[in-house]
Each structure stands twice: as C-alpha cells, then as structure tokens.
A protein has these predicted regions:
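Short, locally clustered residues in the helix-turn-helix/winged-helix DNA-binding domain
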Residues: 16, 44-48, 109, 136
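C-terminal regulatory/oligomerization modules of transcriptional regulators
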Residues: 1-4, 125-145
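A structural preference for long, well-packed, hydrophobic secondary-structure segments
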Residues: 5, 25, 42, 69-74, ...
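Alpha-helical structural signal
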Residues: 8, 12, 19, 39-40, ...
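Amphipathic alpha-helical linker/stalk segments
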Residues: 26-29, 60, 119, 139-145
Length: 145
C-alpha cells in the first residue's frame, strides 16, 4: 500500500453532502411536475434531441437497465418521453423527449445553472474551474465498466 495522506472517507462524505444538496434542490424544482431527482438525469440525457436506446441511457447514466426501464415507463406515462417503436414488442427503439419533456429540460437547465452558482458560491472562479476539472479527471481515470 502506498503512503497516502488523503482521507478517502472525507472525500466521499464531502461529495455525498454536495450530491444531497443538489438532489434536494432538483427535487424541489421538479415536484410540481410529478417528478423527482431520480428522473432528472434521464431528462437531461435526452435533452439534446437525438434520442437514445434504453441500453445507451443506462450506460450514459451508469445505472441498472431495470431502473432505466422503470423510469422511462413512468416518464412515458406522464407524457415527457415517447419512442420510435413502430410495432408491438419492439426490442430496440430510441426514446425522445416530447414537447412537454423539452419544456421541463429547459427549466431544469436554468435551475441547474442557478443552483450551481449557489452551491459553488464560496469558491473563487479559479477554484470552481479547478474543482470541476479535478472531479472529471478522477471520474474518468477511475471509471469502471
């Protein structure tokens, strides 16, 4: 084992607190639409308009395919997504945001921008850029498939 002065538990705890704070804000914003933070990642992943397969969504969001199936079924029921399946029993199809889903995505983007400012307010501009850079560097170097 290498000589390491970094307390991994402190990093995990700090990131967990940030995540909890961000998810709480997200849930508050989505509540009037019958949605929670659980649905947010899917809406944002689909917000570029290209559509994605269920498998691609699961891989993009690093979630279990069964969770993707449940969330997309709910979003479909609520009218936020649709798919391009042309026949019953399609095994592979693309999921897209409906106009209603696109409206939510636009509101989420505005809300996320405001909440990001609030969460990162204690940091200087240089610290913000460094923080985001380091998070992505750690996430990408340690990504497991």
């Amino acid at each position: 084992m290498s000589n390491c002065n970094v307390d991994l538990q402190s990093i995990i705890t700090g990131l967990s607190k940030l995540k909890k704070k961000a998810l709480k804000k997200q849930t508050e914003m989505l509540k009037p639409f019958g949605l929670t933070s659980r649905h947010a990642g899917y809406i944002m992943a689909l917000s570029d308009g290209r559509g994605m397969t269920m498998k691609a969504l699961s891989e993009t969001l690093c979630v279990d395919p069964a969770n993707t199936t449940r969330v997309i079924a709910y979003l479909d029921e609520m009218g936020y997504v649709a798919n391009d399946c042309q026949k019953d029993g399609c095994r592979k199809f693309n999921v897209f945001l409906t106009d209603k889903g696109k409206e939510i995505a636009a509101q989420m983007k505005k809300s996320v921008a405001c909440d990001s400012v609030e969460i990162m307010d204690p940091l200087t501009e240089d610290e913000k850029r460094t923080f985001v850079y380091l998070l992505f560097k750690m996430a990408m170097d340690n990504y497991e498939e």
